[in-house]
Every structure is written in C-alpha cells, then in structure tokens.
C-alpha cells in the first residue's frame, strides 16, 4: 500500500506538470473504485485550471477555483504523467487530459483507491476531517503522543498507526521508526514514557524524511509519477527481514502479528 512517502513522492512528481494547466477532458473507463468515481466528475473538472496539488495524510488534493479532486491510492494505485497519445493498459481507470498534450492517468489494479470531488473545503470532507496531525509538522511531537497514550492498552505500534493519532505512518514506517527508537512494537502505549515518545516522534520524522528523499518504498506496485520505483527498500532495517541480522547488533530479526498487521523487531535492541 502506498504510504505517506510514496504519496508525497507522487505529489512532488506530478505538481510541476499539472499546476497551472487547464483540464480539457476527463475519461473514466471504470468508475468502480472503492467509492465510485462521481458521474459528474468531467463536468466539474473540464475547463478548470489546477491551481495547486497538496497532500493531506495519504490523500492528494487537486485544487481548482471551484472545487477539489481528492485522490487516494488504496492498496495498489498510482498516478502517472504521460503524453496524451499513450494507449491505456489494463487497470488504467481514469485519464485527466491537460491543455499541453499531457495527461494524468490513475491506475489501480485492486481498485481500493478513490477519485472523488468536493466543492467545499476538502479538509471538511468525511474522509479527512477526523484525521490527526501530519507527522512532519510541528504539531506532532512526543508530548502529543504521550498525552493521547494515557490509559491506552493497545500496542505502541498499533497506536502509532492510528490515523486519529497521527496520519500517514503505515506498517513499513511504523516498524522502522520503532526500531530506530529502540521500542518493542508490542509494548503497551500507555506504559511508554514521555522521553521514549520524544525519541519515537523524532524517529518517525527521520524515517519519513529519509523515505521521501529516496522516492518511497516499492515492494510490489508503487511507481512514481515518472514511472520510477522507490529506493527506500534498500535502507529497511527490520521490515520484511525476519531471521536476518539486526543492522545494529546482529541479532536475528523476529516477526509476529501485532494488531492484525505484521511486526518486525530486534529482540535485543528494542524493549
């Protein structure tokens, strides 16, 4: 699943090609995504100029003067910038054709993503309005985590992946941040001290910044806007490395299910 670094990589790749461009045509080949593509999407977008491309959590926001298109990649989605003459392939569901001969193509093999439209403030949309702070913002720090963790019995990894606590920290990056902070994923969130949460918040910021700098992580489907895979996979310390040596102490990495998701950690380094 594309996580925050992959979505931010896409935003940075797409923005120079679409900002300031007018939408000439919208082609919907298959509207059957997680939520159906609105039937009036073409009417809403055609003739509009894309004023800005923003990211909120794992959502991309394409702002125009009259409304905002909201894109989520689900499990396997991606956006590509292509010449308008490039023929669509299987799973290429929507094209947004621009006035310079380019198009923005939404591909989603598993169809768990979405492309929606709102004329209101997108931050008030039901999918966005209850989200927690951005992890790379000043609003996210150890104090924020410690305050919300009081009385929580959930594992700290599950707590960290809760979008109401902080957005965009998916499974890959939660595992990596906990390893950097030397915290065991199954420790109860309510028993983590403020000092340890300070370390964890800083580790989250560092992991996400490193991943963005490397274009995200490609495990299966993710490609950036120019068709390139992400390279952060080469830097993974624990994720998907069960039985391999911890980069810090050489102890074999362990794996288990924590909160219905896969967890990877070093039993010696992380406590």
Task: For each feature predicted by the language model, list its residue ranges.
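Generic detection of long, well-ordered alpha-helical segments
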Residues: 1-4, 135, 139, 193-201
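Glycine-centered secondary-structure boundary/capping sites
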Residues: 20, 47, 130-133, 182
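Phosphate/anion-contacting hairpin/loop surfaces
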Residues: 69-168, 173-180, 188
